[in-house]
């Protein structure tokens, strides 16, 4: 399990194609859901409102190719890189720490270096 919502509205998951999925209050975002999106496009944008209250498990850490992913987010209204998973100083298994990073901006964009197609 990856994300837990406290109240409405929802998380919007989308790629640079036409694939979109809305996650409403109370639904848990699982690794398999991210894997479904990963199979659709190279870029996955996760729009996360400030109502995210916790992150459980290591679904982000184990997401395909996320070890090399660049994490982008808004900090004080300005988009900037938060680093890569390999170098980012975040305890991914600590819900409070990751949730605070998610709250620091409007979204976190998972940008993978290689597509799943590159491995096939």
Region annotations inferred by a language model:
Residues 1-31, 40-54, 64-77, 83-120:
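Structural signature of tandem-repeat unit edges
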